Structure formats: structure tokens, C-alpha cells
Amino acid sequence: MIDKEVAELRRRYRQDRSNITKIHGCYVNVHGELVSAFTLSMGLLPEGEQEKYLELLKKGISGRMGKTLSDLSFSTAQVADSDEHRLLMRLRDSGLEDEEAVQTLYEKIAGSLHLADNYLILLAADRYDVPFRSRDGFRQEEGSEQQFSYILCSICPVKETKPVLRYDSAEGKFHERGTDWVAAAPEVGFLFPAFDDRATNLYGALYYTKNTDNSYEEFVSAVFNLQPPMPAGTQRETFREVLTDALEDECSVNVVQNVHTALRELVLTHKETRAEEPLAVTRQEVGAVLEHCGVSEPKMAAFNVKYDEAFGGGSEVPPQNLLGAAQLEYRTPDVVIRVNPDR
């Protein structure tokens, strides 16, 4: 998916746009035990509560692709016949009315997702009549020809508040208010199926993590039977290690500056052109910069091997995830290179 498609779905999470009729939830304690489960009718909730639930669901697909959001892709074999894909399809096709499937998902999540706090699993099913867009990008409601049916899951830590003094307007005095347990912004979330090219893609899902340094591998394995992408927060450090370990004594200030200049130019050009497709670089593109810097063939061969080991063969990495430091730092066995990226 691309950011524009995610934003189109996020705009639905308002009372006047959403087709969500029920909210399904499960409260899980820190020991992974299911404390309680519930189903709420949106139409019977006070307006304020409806807004709060929609806000928490919306935040489960917040951020940008390549940072807090990433695509998960199922294999053809999984889509054809696998327990994990079959469960997601049961949830989606039933609009979460299949109670056994919902319970199974709760148990999978509780058994694989370990947070520091208790947490609340929120589930919702939505049906989106996708408006037709003409070639010039204008939206035409009457031209809608397809419906996108999907489920959304937001998993929110439940935190204990501190005692505070609150104002009692009847008495005109302040009194202590005890502790409460409140649902915080989602830590993890997903949407299934994917909304690729503004259409249903049963081979994909959208995955969200608030913490860009943690991909919650056990959770992804339990629910999707997939390997999660490398966390965005880990990619820069991994790239630094690949360069320094592979190039060794050839990892000079000039090489470091040239690599980062090339990556930054790609990011700036992508922003200026306002391209919709996510920006990504391959090993070959980074390798071309290293060759231009005069890196020797043996070191290039070592770089190719270490890059593929770290990121995967044929992988594409958002270049902005490889940048971001105010001061670049590369360590070799004999020296630490610190470079101002703007110089």
C-alpha cells in the first residue's frame, strides 16, 4: 500500500463516514490471560464514546509507510490453504460475526503479544464503497463500482493513572480522584486485506507498530505465519554495520559522505516530485555509489554478501530509514568516523 491509500481509509473513521456498526473488544492482562470480552453496538453508544473508539481504531493505521506502517505479503500457498489466512478470511467474510473465529484471534494475540501493561484488543469490520476516480484524480461518488470489505485491529496498552485532585463543582472544592485504568494509543495494529491500487488484495495485510525499534516478531508469526520486516529504527544501525564490516579500511570519510549524499538526494527528489509510490533503494543502487567512490572489488563482494544477509536478497529499503542522524558515525576497528552530513 502507499500513504495515499492509507490516508483514504483513515478519513473514514468519523461517525458520518464509517460503516462500522459494532466494536469487538477483549481485555488481556500482563500474563496473557483473557480477562473479559465484549461486543458493543455503535448506535447505542454516546457520541463521545463512539469518537473515542473510532480514534483508537484510526491510530492503528497511523504514521507513514516504511516507518510505523509496513506491508505483509502472503505466499500463494498460504492464500490457497493455510490456517492463518483461513482465519483472517473467516473474520473478514463474516464481518466479525463468527464468534469462534474472533475468540481464536484473541487467543492467538494473547499468547504471542507481550507488552509491559495490560492491553485492549479492539476489532472492527468496515465496508467501503470505493469511489471512482477519474484520470485527473477527481472523486466521483456515483461512479463507485466496487466495495472494499476489511477488518481492522488496534491493540492498546491499558495504563493506570495517578491519583489527582479534581474539582467538584457542586461543593466548590477539590477532592482526590483515585486511580483509573485507561486505554492508551495503539502499540500494534493491522488491517486485512490490503487496499492496493484502491482495491482488495487478499495476498496482503497492513501492519502497524508504534515502536519503530520493535517488530513484535512472535505476534506476526502467530497471527500471519510470516517474518516481519526489519523495524525502521533498526535499519540505519544495520546499514552502518554492513558498511563498516564489509569495507573495513576502505570505509573512509569520502565514502561515507558520498553514500549519505546520494541517499539524501533521492529522498529530496522524491519529495519534490510528490511521487505516490514509496521510495526504496536496492543493494545495487548503493553498490553503484560505492563503485563510483573507488571501492575495490573484494570489498564490493563483501558488501554484497553482508547486505543480503542483513536485509535479504532482492530487498528494497526506504532510504530515509538509513539516514536521520544529526551526525553520522561509522566505527572501524581502528577509528571512529564522525561526519556532518551537511558538509
Outline where the language-model segments fall.
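Long, hydrophobic alpha/beta structural blocks
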Residues: 3-19, 24-331, 338
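Hydrophobic, glycine-enriched assembly/anchoring segments
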Residues: 342-343
